[in-house]
């Protein structure tokens, strides 16, 4: 990790208190892009949406993603979700993922890798809908370029309304 740092001040005299110079890491400017989506999810169906910056950004590298989701559902129901990275676009969600557990099927294991996962369970009084939400902050390591794809995939046990917002931290 230290190999890509710059060592300035090597020409200075070395002192016991301070070495040849202080290293510094070059910081690339990061832009934040917020995207807002809403959808109606059907019962027992695997659905997903792509997480990417909106607008006319041609070349980018996603470094971090902050995912915020708000759900309105009856009590006693469950929503499973996973965040996956894929080398090619996913067209058929049910062909790529198993139904309740959202595991990657064997035919797609070479192109899809799971980054994060979670679940949301609702509780409350029967007969009334309750609103649940979750926040997930995902660090993407070396980053995801514009040629790769990042998806959030969900499975619900009941039909519900979903509001999904994500803030993408990108390097241009």
UniProtKB/Swiss-Prot annotation:
Give the gene symbol. Answer: DNA-S
Protein family according to the UniProt entry: Belongs to the nanoviridae capsid protein family.
From the Swiss-Prot or TrEMBL record, give the protein name: Capsid protein
Q: Does the keyword Hydrolase apply?
A: no
List locations, semicolon-separated. Answer: Virion
Question: Which InterPro entries does this one have?
Answer: Nanovirus_coat
Question: What is the source species?
Answer: Milk vetch dwarf virus (isolate N) (MDV)
Residues in a coiled coil are: none
Keywords linked to the UniProt accession:
Capsid protein, T=1 icosahedral capsid protein, Virion
Q: Name one GO cellular component term.
A: T=1 icosahedral viral capsid
Its main subcellular localisation, reduced to a broad class, is virion
């Amino acid at each position: 990790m230290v190999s890509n740092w710059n060592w300035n001040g090597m020409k200075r005299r070395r002192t016991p208190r301070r070495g040849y110079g202080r290293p510094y890491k070059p910081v690339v400017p990061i832009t934040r892009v917020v995207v807002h989506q809403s959808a109606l999810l059907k019962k027992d169906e695997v659905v997903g949406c792509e997480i990417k910056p909106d607008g006319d950004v041609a070349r980018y590298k996603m470094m971090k993603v902050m995912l915020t989701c708000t759900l309105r559902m009856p009590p006693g129901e469950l929503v499973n979700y996973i965040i996956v990275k894929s080398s090619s676009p996913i067209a058929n969600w049910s062909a790529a993922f198993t139904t309740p557990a959202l595991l990657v099927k064997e035919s797609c294991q070479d192109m899809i890798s799971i980054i994060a996962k979670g679940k949301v369970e609702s509780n409350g009084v029967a007969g009334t809908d309750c609103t649940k939400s979750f926040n997930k902050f995902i660090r993407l390591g070396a980053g995801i370029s514009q040629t790769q794809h990042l998806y959030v995939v969900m499975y619900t046990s009941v039909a519900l309304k979903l509001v999904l917002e994500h803030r993408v931290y990108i390097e241009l």
